[in-house]
């Protein structure tokens, strides 16, 4: 199936790429394989993301009396991911139909907006969660006001407001139009720019997604976790009985940052290369363009996978949160066995330290 007039670089899951802009005329990429494979990926992410984030939201909601500051950020992170994954059946259908959008203009705008809203809100929640853990571990005594309930509410309000504003271009500019035999969901700059200046709009929107949506959060999270790792190492260096706990904490910290980078880095690298080509800083051959075009949808899928990994990375690695999940879903025997195994392997002093850590540090 051909996509007449549709630049493959516009692969519709990159919500800020423009149509047929900045690319030299090249042979079209064969999308037949992607039309079959990508919808399957989308639906797998949909099922895992819907169930995983749903469990997180339910658990956070049920544990309100004992909710920690980290739990509040985890719940909002899950809400942001959930708002995105519910749109995946639409994008799966769109791809399976060969980039034909049968759902109308309103859903085109709303679905595109939710994707960008998720990207920003999710990244900002992760950054605030990292900052909260940094304060709890590195400045546990002096950060009480910054980690108070009112401060968390204000920070969440800022997260959602800022995310909503950054995602507005998608809501305003995205619309449906007929392209050959297909109706596509695409960015339309005709109301704000001439055809000659579209590249500048696309370049600006590309920077808008990459800098505040990836580079700055990744830099901040790396800094926070470096301080956390240093503090944990100093705290446990003379406590041999805590050696395994130290290694576990450091492993989780490293995993959080690495998984985030792995999921999003390929997407932003390809988008940056396209931006540099668009603005004339690079002159890519047709073969190079075709490689980028072929890799781009799968880099996008990898970024989407982060929405179904987050519940496991940021919630189920947490002993206290995992215990709450078992309790609220009626797995009391599993919980009792888990606590029994934990008790048999820890000394009384270590248990006391563990309980204190779970209650105040994470």
Swiss-Prot record:
<feature type="transmembrane region" description="Helical; Name=6">
    <location>
        <begin position="249"/>
        <end position="269"/>
    </location>
</feature>
<dbReference type="GO" id="GO:0030593">
    <property type="term" value="P:neutrophil chemotaxis"/>
</dbReference>
<feature type="topological domain" description="Cytoplasmic">
    <location>
        <begin position="221"/>
        <end position="248"/>
    </location>
</feature>
<dbReference type="InterPro" id="IPR000248">
    <property type="entry name" value="ATII_rcpt"/>
</dbReference>
<keyword id="KW-0675">Receptor</keyword>
<dbReference type="GO" id="GO:0030154">
    <property type="term" value="P:cell differentiation"/>
</dbReference>
<keyword id="KW-1015">Disulfide bond</keyword>
<keyword id="KW-0812">Transmembrane</keyword>
<dbReference type="GO" id="GO:0005737">
    <property type="term" value="C:cytoplasm"/>
</dbReference>
<feature type="glycosylation site" description="N-linked (GlcNAc...) asparagine">
    <location>
        <position position="181"/>
    </location>
</feature>
<dbReference type="GO" id="GO:0019722">
    <property type="term" value="P:calcium-mediated signaling"/>
</dbReference>
<dbReference type="GO" id="GO:0140897">
    <property type="term" value="F:mechanoreceptor activity"/>
</dbReference>
<keyword id="KW-0472">Membrane</keyword>
<dbReference type="Pfam" id="PF00001">
    <property type="entry name" value="7tm_1"/>
</dbReference>
<keyword id="KW-1133">Transmembrane helix</keyword>
<keyword id="KW-0807">Transducer</keyword>
<feature type="topological domain" description="Cytoplasmic">
    <location>
        <begin position="59"/>
        <end position="76"/>
    </location>
</feature>
<dbReference type="GO" id="GO:0051281">
    <property type="term" value="P:positive regulation of release of sequestered calcium ion into cytosol"/>
</dbReference>
<keyword id="KW-0297">G-protein coupled receptor</keyword>
<feature type="disulfide bond">
    <location>
        <begin position="108"/>
        <end position="185"/>
    </location>
</feature>
<feature type="topological domain" description="Extracellular">
    <location>
        <begin position="173"/>
        <end position="199"/>
    </location>
</feature>
<dbReference type="GO" id="GO:0043951">
    <property type="term" value="P:negative regulation of cAMP-mediated signaling"/>
</dbReference>
<dbReference type="GO" id="GO:0019957">
    <property type="term" value="F:C-C chemokine binding"/>
</dbReference>
<dbReference type="GO" id="GO:0007204">
    <property type="term" value="P:positive regulation of cytosolic calcium ion concentration"/>
</dbReference>
<dbReference type="GO" id="GO:0001525">
    <property type="term" value="P:angiogenesis"/>
</dbReference>
<keyword id="KW-1003">Cell membrane</keyword>
<feature type="transmembrane region" description="Helical; Name=2">
    <location>
        <begin position="77"/>
        <end position="97"/>
    </location>
</feature>
<feature type="topological domain" description="Extracellular">
    <location>
        <begin position="1"/>
        <end position="37"/>
    </location>
</feature>
<dbReference type="InterPro" id="IPR017452">
    <property type="entry name" value="GPCR_Rhodpsn_7TM"/>
</dbReference>
<feature type="glycosylation site" description="N-linked (GlcNAc...) asparagine">
    <location>
        <position position="19"/>
    </location>
</feature>
<dbReference type="GO" id="GO:0001569">
    <property type="term" value="P:branching involved in blood vessel morphogenesis"/>
</dbReference>
<dbReference type="GO" id="GO:0045766">
    <property type="term" value="P:positive regulation of angiogenesis"/>
</dbReference>
<feature type="transmembrane region" description="Helical; Name=7">
    <location>
        <begin position="297"/>
        <end position="317"/>
    </location>
</feature>
<dbReference type="GO" id="GO:0001568">
    <property type="term" value="P:blood vessel development"/>
</dbReference>
<keyword id="KW-0221">Differentiation</keyword>
<dbReference type="GO" id="GO:0009897">
    <property type="term" value="C:external side of plasma membrane"/>
</dbReference>
<dbReference type="GO" id="GO:0005886">
    <property type="term" value="C:plasma membrane"/>
</dbReference>
<feature type="disulfide bond">
    <location>
        <begin position="26"/>
        <end position="286"/>
    </location>
</feature>
<dbReference type="GO" id="GO:0060182">
    <property type="term" value="F:apelin receptor activity"/>
</dbReference>
<dbReference type="GO" id="GO:0007507">
    <property type="term" value="P:heart development"/>
</dbReference>
<dbReference type="GO" id="GO:0060183">
    <property type="term" value="P:apelin receptor signaling pathway"/>
</dbReference>
<keyword id="KW-0037">Angiogenesis</keyword>
């Amino acid at each position: 199936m051909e996509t007449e007039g549709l630049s493959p670089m516009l692969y519709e899951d990159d919500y800020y790429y423009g149509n047929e802009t900045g690319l030299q005329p090249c042979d079209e990429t064969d999308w037949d394989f992607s039309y079959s494979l990508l919808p399957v990926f989308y639906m797998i992410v949909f099922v895992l993301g819907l169930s995983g984030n749903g469990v997180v939201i339910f658990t956070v909601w049920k544990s309100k009396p004992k909710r920690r500051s980290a739990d509040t950020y985890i719940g909002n992170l899950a809400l942001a991911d959930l708002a995105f994954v519910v749109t995946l059946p639409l994008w799966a259908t769109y791809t399976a139909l060969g980039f034909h959008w049968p759902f109308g203009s309103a859903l085109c705008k709303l679905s595109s907006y939710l994707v960008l809203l998720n990207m920003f809100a999710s990244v900002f929640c992760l950054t605030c969660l990292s900052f909260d853990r940094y304060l709890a571990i590195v400045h546990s005594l002096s950060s009480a006001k910054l980690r108070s309930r009112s401060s968390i509410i204000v920070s969440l309000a800022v997260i959602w407001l800022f995310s909503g504003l950054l995602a507005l271009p998608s809501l305003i500019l995205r619309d449906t139009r007929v392209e050959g035999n297909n109706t596509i969901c695409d960015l339309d700059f005709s109301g704000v720019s001439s055809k000659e200046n579209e590249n500048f709009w696309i370049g600006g929107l590309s920077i808008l997604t990459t800098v505040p949506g990836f580079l700055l959060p990744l830099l901040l999270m790396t800094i926070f976790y470096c301080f956390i790792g240093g503090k944990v190492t100093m705290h446990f260096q003379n406590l041999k009985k805590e050696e395994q706990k130290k290694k576990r904490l450091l492993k989780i910290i490293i995993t959080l940052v690495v998984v985030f980078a792995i999921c999003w880095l390929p997407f932003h690298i390809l988008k940056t290369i396209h931006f540099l080509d668009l603005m004339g800083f690079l002159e890519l051959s047709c073969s190079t363009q075709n490689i980028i075009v072929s890799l781009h949808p799968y880099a996008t899928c990898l970024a989407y996978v982060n929405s179904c990994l987050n519940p496991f990375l940021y919630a189920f690695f947490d002993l206290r949160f995992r215990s709450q999940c078992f309790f609220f879903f009626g797995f009391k025997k599993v919980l009792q066995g888990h606590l029994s195994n934990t008790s048999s392997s820890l000394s009384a002093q270590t248990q006391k330290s563990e309980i204190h850590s779970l209650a105040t540090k994470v």
